[in-house]
Amino acid sequence: MDLTESFKTLSDKAIFTIAGVGQRDGIPAKEADAGWPLGVVRRPDGDLIVVDYQWHRIWRIDKDGILHAFAGDGIAGRSGDDGPAIEARFCNPHDLFQDRHGHLYLSDLGNNTIRRIDYETGVITLVAGTGQVGRGGDGGLAIEAEMDCSCGVAVDEAGYIYLSSEWTNNIRRIDPKNGLIETVFGQIARHYPSEQGHSRPFAGSGLSLGGYHGDGGSAKEAGFNHPEHLVFDSMGNLYVCDNSNDRIRKIDMKSEIITTVLGNGQRASNGDGGPAIEASILMPDAICLDVHDNLYVGEKYGFRIRKVEHETGMVRTLVGTGEPGFGEEGLHGSVTRCNSVEAGIYADPDGTVFWGDCSGRTRRYDGQTGIVTTILGGTSVHDDEAAVGGFLNGPGGLSVGPDGHIYVADVWNQRIRAIDPFTGIIRAIAGSGA
């Protein structure tokens, strides 16, 4: 397609797409252009639900692999509570938890809120947060409390909702009977929101910054360092993804004793084939448990998916070589590269694992064969093809060269790409996506 001729025929104020397919549903998910898929769970009906952090939506992938819009209209904002989730607006939705009834709890990170989608009705409601960044509200209603980077959410069998506060380094709990919120684990830090919307420590007695201590004692007095995600096992114990301590920790909810189950605190990724507590993990940023209580962990900077066997306590790598990259398609997990794994990971009973990585895809590890495939986001960015069919993931800066070539910073695909004005073909001129 000769773009120069198309431009000549444009009328005033007309819009003409020259690159990118945008947000499409009703097509095979593996052919869709996703933004940044993070949280992922399987619904009781068998469909997969995927959070798209970048495009402010939640997707549904049906059993035939077709992609459907599930919640959100794709425009960043905060609206729609007490109405259909499909009409709601989110801002950088992050983590996702499904309770035993199929209800979904969502960390709407950019809005500093926790929201719930009813399984039967599809209605979305506010669970916690005023939208203000901060730490206040303990002892009062959760919907009147401030949130400070509450990435992780988990719900126990009794309906109590647990939130991990990444920047205040503790865990809060919401009582389902009265809606009150309190801090239950981790020393209480006092913070205030900065001009940039981040949380900074406020000097004074009782201040607790991130750290590592407390194993073997009460979780109430334990030190966490950016606890990001939470999950319960079949016995009701709470697992904490203690990100910057490079550990996964477990809280016995009967005794409230905390221990480490994976990671020795070294900033590395090794120890496969040995005890998980002697191994190292590099910034764990996603955790889940299967029905057998096997633990699965995604490493943000180790670029791996690791598994800890419940029966033996031994750890091994399922996917990843330790080198970041777009990742090979259809190969065994042992030779397939991962990009950073953040927030989203889910495991079926047979050990099949789904996760989102920062290449803009949701991927699948087959628990029987070990083969890795892409289920959402495409296996290619479609270089050397017509730009209108190309995948752009967070296009940023744009410039036109003296020869008419259009240059685009394809941010999340980690490339600089050029569009030929005479052929309409897009190609990468810098960056490999790694």
Regions flagged by a language model, labelled:
Residues Y53, L109, E166-W167, N243, ...:
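Short loop/turn segments immediately following the C-termini of beta-strands
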Residues D2-W36, I66-N92, G122-C149, G179-H226, ...:
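Gly/Pro-rich loop segments of beta-rich domains
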Residues D47-I49, H103-Y105, Y160-L163, N237-Y239, ...:
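Conserved beta-propeller blade signature
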Residues H56-W59, N112-R116, V123, N169-R173, ...:
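A short loop-to-beta-strand structural motif that recurs across blades of beta-propeller domains
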Residues G39, D95, G152, H229, ...:
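Conserved beta-strand position repeated once per blade in WD40 beta-propeller domains
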Residues R42-D45, Q98-H101, V155-A158, F232-M235, ...:
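Residue-level detector of Asp-centered blade-edge/turn motifs that repeat once per structural unit
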Residues A347, I406-I425, A430:
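Blade-level signature of beta-propeller repeat domains, shared across WD40, Kelch, NHL, RCC1
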